[in-house]
C-alpha cells in the first residue's frame, strides 16, 4: 500500500536514497541499499577469500565500498566447520609460502560450528565456508572479493596480490561470537555484532510465544 507498493528495496533506495538512508549514508553508498542477505549452502568447500576495507576499495576499486560480513549458521552437519582468521603465529611470509605451495588452509583457524552459531568476518579476515554448513550471510552491499585459494579447482581467477594487501595480519579476535541474551516479554534477544560501515546492529531475536498484535486505531 502507499507510494512504494510493489517496489523492491533496490528500486526504493535508488529512487529516493537520501530519504531512505539519510544524506551521509546515501552519499557513501552511492544510492545503493547498504546491506545484502544471502543463503550459502556449501555442499563442498567454498573458495578461500578476503574482502577489502572501505579505504582500500575506495582507492583501488573505483570508489566502491569494502565488505564486512556476519554468518548465522542455519544448519551444519556433525563435525562441519568454517575457516576464519589466521592461526596464532601465522604472518605474511607464512601465508605467502603457503600460497606458493598450495596449502593455505593450514594457515587458517578451523572452527567447528553448529546450528545457531554466529561468525563475524570483518574486512581483512581470510575466510571460507566449508562443506556441510548452511549459513545466512549478512553483508555490506559490495561485490569486491579477492580469491586466494580454490581447493585445486581450475578456471576462476585468483587475486593474491590484492588479497595479501588487505589481509589484517594483526587480527587475532575470536570469530565465533558470544551471545549475551536479554529477556523480553515473550522473546529474548542478543546483539550479535555491530557493523561500523554502514552503522548497524545485527541482533538475533527468538520468540518464546506468540506476541499480541498491535492494532492501530484510525
Regions of interest found by a model, annotated:
Residues 1-90, 150-193:
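Transition-metal
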Residues 33, 44, 66-69, 115, ...:
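A generic structural signal for well-ordered coil/turn residues at beta-strand boundaries
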Residues 48-51, 112-131, 140:
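Conserved metal-binding segment of the jelly-roll/cupin
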Residues 56-57, 79-84, 90-95, 121-122, ...:
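Short, well-ordered, mixed-charge alpha-helical segments that flank or form enzyme active sites
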Residues 68, 130-133:
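Short edge beta-strand segments in beta-sheet-rich domains
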Residues 90-120, 142:
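Active-site glycine-rich loop that binds ribose-phosphate moieties when present
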Residues 105-112, 133-218:
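Fe(II)/2-oxoglutarate
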Amino acid at each position: 500500500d502507499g507510494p512504494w507498493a510493489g517496489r523492491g528495496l533496490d528500486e526504493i533506495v535508488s529512487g529516493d536514497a537520501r530519504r531512505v538512508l539519510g544524506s551521509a549514508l546515501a552519499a557513501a553508498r552511492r544510492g545503493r541499499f547498504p546491506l545484502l542477505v544471502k543463503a550459502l549452502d556449501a555442499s563442498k568447500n567454498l573458495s578461500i577469500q578476503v574482502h577489502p576495507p572501505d579505504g582500500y576499495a575506495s582507492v583501488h576499486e573505483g570508489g566502491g565500498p569494502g565488505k564486512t560480513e556476519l554468518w548465522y549458521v542455519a544448519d551444519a552437519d556433525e563435525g562441519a566447520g568454517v575457516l576464519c582468521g589466521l592461526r596464532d603465529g601465522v604472518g605474511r611470509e607464512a601465508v605467502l609460502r603457503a600460497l606458493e605451495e598450495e596449502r593455505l588452509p593450514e594457515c587458517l583457524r578451523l572452527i567447528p560450528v553448529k546450528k545457531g552459531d554466529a561468525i563475524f568476518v570483518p574486512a581483512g579476515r581470510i575466510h571460507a565456508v566449508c562443506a556441510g554448513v548452511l549459513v545466512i550471510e549478512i553483508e555490506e552491499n559490495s561485490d569486491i572479493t579477492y580469491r586466494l585459494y580454490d581447493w585445486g579447482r581450475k578456471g576462476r581467477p585468483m587475486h593474491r596480490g590484492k588479497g595479501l594487501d588487505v589481509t589484517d595480519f594483526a587480527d587475532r579476535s575470536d570469530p565465533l561470537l558470544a551471545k549475551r541474551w536479554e529477556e523480553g516479554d515473550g522473546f529474548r534477544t542478543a546483539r550479535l555484532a555491530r557493523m561500523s560501515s554502514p552503522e548497524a546492529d545485527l541482533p538475533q531475536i527468538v520468540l518464546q510465544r506468540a506476541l499480541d498484535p498491535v492494532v492501530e486505531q484510525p
